[in-house]
Each structure stands twice: as C-alpha cells, then as structure tokens.
Curated annotation (Swiss-Prot):
Keyword Ligase carried by entry: no
Chain positions recorded as substrate 2 binding sites: S417, S418, K451
Active site: E157 (proton donor/acceptor)
Xref: InterPro entries: Aldolase_II/adducin_N, Aldolase_II/adducin_N_sf, Enolase-ppase_E1, HAD-like_sf, HAD-SF_hydro_IA, HAD_sf, MethylthioRu-1-P_deHdtase_MtnB, MtnB_viridiplantae
Family per similarity comment: In the N-terminal section; belongs to the aldolase class II family. MtnB subfamily. In the C-terminal section; belongs to the HAD-like hydrolase superfamily. MasA/MtnC family.
GO biological process: L-methionine salvage from methylthioadenosine
PANTHER family for this protein: ENOLASE-PHOSPHATASE E1 (PTHR20371:SF1)
Source taxonomy: Eukaryota, Viridiplantae, Streptophyta, Embryophyta, Tracheophyta
SUPFAM superfamilies: AraD/HMP-PK domain-like, HAD-like
Name of the protein in its database record: Probable bifunctional methylthioribulose-1-phosphate dehydratase/enolase-phosphatase E1
UniProt: Zn(2+) binding residues: H132, H134, H207
Length: 518
C-alpha cells in the first residue's frame, strides 16, 4: 500500500526496520503530530477536519532524507487526535503503519489527501516537517488581489521569523490556483517550489497554505509568522494602507477613500476604474553602467567564489546553492554546454566538489549566463562584498532624483533584472546616494521568467495588479527585452547609456539618455 508514488531510496530498508518503526523516535513523532493537531485546531487552522501536519521521526543515526515520516489522517476530528491515529510512511511515501478502524460514527482510516504534496516538500526541499493550514487569513490574503500570482510584503516585524528574511526584506509567497481535489494541486505546488527556491511556503488561492521547515519547531514558527503577516495585510487593507511598500503609505497614492466600505467602493472593493501606474526598471545599462557589472561585480564574484564556497560549505544557504548548481550542471552536460564539468557527489572530498563548482561557475560567468543557480550564488558572494564595504552600488546620477520624484508622486517602482533579488537589494541599498530601496516597491528576477520572453512580463503585470499592462512603463537597454515587454502590452522606453549595445535601425521604440527626460 502506498500513500503516494515514489521510487525507493537507498535508506529504505534501514528506515523500515521493525526496531525503528516501533522505536522511541516514531512514538514521539506520533504524539507530537497529535498534539500539534489539537493545538492548531484551537488556532482555527485545521477546523472541520481540514488541514494536516506531518513530521520526520527524528533519528540522529539516519540522514534526514532517510527518516520515517509520520502524517495525520484524513477525516478525523483534529481536536480529538491521538498518537494511535497517525500513519507512518517510509522516506519515499510507502505506508508502513496504519491506524486501526474505530466504531461508528468514525470513518474508516485514510491517509491525508495532502500526502503527495507533503512528499514534494520533503523531496524537493529536504523538509523535516510540513504544515497545511486552512486558516481564514491564508484564504483572504489570496483574495486581496485576485489576479496576483504572489503575496508580497515588506518592512513588517514578523518577516524576520521567515527563514532567510529580515525586517527590510521583501517577503514573496507564490500563489497557486485551487482545484476541486487536493491531489490535483501536486504539480502546481512542485512548480512553485522549483520556481521560488527561497520560499518556505506556497499559498493556495481561496484554500490555505503549505509551510515547511527543517524541523517541526521551524515549520511551526514560520507558520505562526505567516498567519500573523497575512492577518496584518488584511487589516492594513481595511485601513487603506499599502503593506507592499517600505513606507506603508496609502493604497493607490491616497486616492482610495479611507473606509474600504465607502459608497464609492462597492462591497469594499477598489474602484475598477481607478488608474494604477507602475514603472519597472532594468539595471544593467538602465539604472547602472554596464561597466560596473562587467568590470566590478562579475570579477568580484569570480575571484571570490572559491573563498566563499570554502568558508560557507556546511551552511544551509550554500548547500542550497550547490543543490541548484548541480541541477543546472546536469542539464548543461546533457545539452553539451561548453565548459560544463561533472560535480562529484556530496560525500566526495570537499576540495574535489569545490574545484568542480568553481570551474562551472567561472564558465557560466564568462558566458554571461542568465540562470537562477548562478545569480543566486553571485548574490550571496556580493552580499559579503557589500557588508565588508569592498563593494558599493553604482547608479547613474539622474536615477536617485527620478526615483524620489516617482515615489513622491505615488508611482510604484519595481526592478526586473537577471541578477537575483538579493543582489538587486544589495546594489540599491548600498549606493553613494544612500539606501535607495525606500523608493522601490519590489524586485523581480529570473524566477519570474526569462527577460526576453513575453510571458515573463505577463506574469509581472499579474503580480502588480494593474487593470491593464499598458499602465506599466518598462525601461531597458536591451532591444529583445523591449520587444517582449511590448508584446505583453507594456509601454516601453529604451535607455541609451554609455557602453550600451547599439540598437537595430528603425527599431520603433522611444529612447532616452536620462531619466530626467521621462
């Protein structure tokens, strides 16, 4: 019997031993899941038999990936859960232990419908626990902007409770569309997990949220923070306050009435005729000289990649970077990409692994590849450079004034660059003009899509919640990006800066040499 499909791992035989299955680790995990179910019922997260929880049965003698899994059942009242109600699964999803049937009116035992989704978090993120909540705030948070593919928030205290985030960071949670049956969400959840490598949660529109962590404590803590932040966003929305910007000013440039139940906003919804305008900026050759990126940023990453990998090799962040690089290199080797070399397995000598990683990264940098695995690692290396003051962000002189002007006029400004979101924030947060992030509302990178593909700009327009893509101005120096954005309905201006590549004759786009011309 299998709760969900999956190949058998090398540690399967060991994890299925009778001693482990009947041992203290599994017993404690059963009791823990039952306790958490009862606790979350009181929070309103798992009422009406909805929602579910799963944890790994912690055995220090086994790698996390090989540990047994305990899952709550389906159809059992969460406030009455006991350890004996739990299912125990192998690391690859095979049911090893099922609860016994209870007399009427109890339903026959059944493993949670969330099982295949839980397994995606275990296999793709190396999770130690996953929580699925139906908390009301998780549903309403996805309704604030029905067209948005992401929930975004910044400058809110509890953001720092989310792994990899601080108070000033922008929290981005992907939103997937709901389906009639839970198992039908499996593929879209997996796609969201793959597309958002820094995310520790996925929202399901009008449904709930999946949250994972490397332990049950981490998953629980993050789940509590997410629920707090969603509740805060809902309350800020009711007050007409924008939760997506650092200053948390009035929504829609103070044009929205103070009461969301104003007669001018039927049923508390913003006037569909109200006009929203956004500016989306490229970085290289638009806000920043290409020479700064090619002559300063790239060489710094190239020259420090070995030092960075060596000093941080055992950190969770670098392990995730290496994991993404492995996936990319395997694909590159299949496609015959020049400069790609095999990366030894994790249990190989550290220096051998690092040597292979350095060779691949140097080749990627030389080819100026716009791939997420490289950009994420570069961002982490640059962070060290900015923190040590070895690096300082460079922008053209006209950029700060334009950002201030747009900000003061209520225009929302976003960045879309092939560099990681972290790298973007580092650049604008550490300039000779001070921290310019206060004028920016969000950051997009290649996790949104390739900058030369029209669908990427369609995704951005959906995230920004405008009534029409034509309400977005995109400024770039790259002709192919301009064409893609225009095809998505954006207004487009091409930036002419020193060092930029020449444009085709009769390209048909408006051009500027300074933001002051806009």
């Amino acid at each position: 019997m299998a709760c969900c499909g999956g190949g058998r791992g090398e540690g399967a035989a060991a994890t299925e031993s009778e001693a482990y299955l009947e041992g203290e680790a599994v017993r404690e995990a059963r009791e823990l899941v039952a306790e958490l179910c009862r606790h979350f019922y009181g929070q309103g997260w798992v009422t009406g038999t909805g929602g579910s929880i799963t944890v790994k049965a912690n055995d220090p003698a086994l790698p996390l990936a090989d540990q047994l899994i305990v899952m709550s059942p389906s159809g059992v009242q969460k406030e009455r859960m006991v350890a004996e109600d739990m299912y125990v699964l192998s690391a690859d999803g095979k049911v090893l232990s099922s609860p016994v049937s209870k007399p009427w009116p109890n339903k026959p035992p059944k493993c949670t419908d969330c099982a295949p989704l839980f397994m995606k978090a275990y296999l793709m993120r190396g999770a130690g626990a996953v929580i699925h909540s139906h908390g009301m705030e998780t549903c309403i948070a996805t309704m604030l902007d029905p067209g948005a593919k992401e929930f975004r928030m910044t400058h809110m205290e509890m953001i720092k409770g989310i792994k990899g985030h601080g108070y000033r960071d922008e929290l981005v949670v992907p939103i997937i569309e709901n389906t009639p049956y839970e198992y039908e969400l499996t593929d879209s959840l997996a796609e969201a997990i793959a597309a958002y490598p820094k995310a520790t949660a996925v929202l399901v529109r009008n449904h709930g949220i999946y949250v994972w962590g490397d332990s049950w404590i981490n998953a629980k803590t993050q789940a509590e923070c997410y629920h707090y932040l969603f509740d805060a966003a809902i309350k800020l929305y009711q007050l007409g306050i924008d939760w997506t910007t650092p200053e948390h000013g009035p929504i829609n440039s103070a044009k929205r009435p103070r009461s969301v139940l104003s007669s001018s906003i039927p049923n508390g919804c913003p006037d569909s005729k109200s006009s929203k305008h956004c500016v989306v900026l490229d970085i290289e050759g638009t806000t920043t000289p290409i020479s700064f990126v090619t002559d300063v940023m790239f060489p710094y990453a190239r020259d420090n990649v070995r030092k960075h990998l060596t000093s941080t090799y055992s950190s969770d962040e670098t392990k995730e970077d290496i994991k993404l690089l492995r996936i990319q290199v395997e694909e590159d080797l299949k496609n015959g990409i020049v400069g790609s070399v095999p990366i030894p397995p994790d249990d190989a000598d550290k220096e051998e692994v690092i040597n292979a990683l350095v060779a691949n990264v140097e080749s990627m940098i030389k080819a100026d590849r716009k791939i997420t695995s490289l950009k994420q690692l570069q961002g982490h290396i640059w962070r060290t450079g900015f923190e040590s003051k070895e690096l300082q962000g460079v922008v053209f002189d006209d950029v700060p004034e334009a950002l201030k002007h747009w900000h003061a006029s209520g225009m929302k400004v976003y960045i879309y660059s092939s560099g990681s979101r972290e790298a973007q924030r580092l650049l604008f947060g550490n300039t000779a003009y001070g921290d310019l992030r206060q004028y920016l509302c969000g950051f997009f990178d290649t996790t949104t899509g390739n900058k030369r593909e029209t669908r990427s700009y369609f995704e951005i327009s959906q995230s920004l919640g405008v009534d029409s893509p034509a309400q977005i101005l995109f400024i770039t120096d790259v002709f192919q990006e301009a064409v893609a954005a225009k095809s998505a309905g954006f207004e487009v201006i091409i930036s002419i800066r020193p060092g930029n590549a020449p444009l085709p004759e009769n390209h048909g786009f408006r051009t500027i040499k300074s933001f002051s011309e806009i």
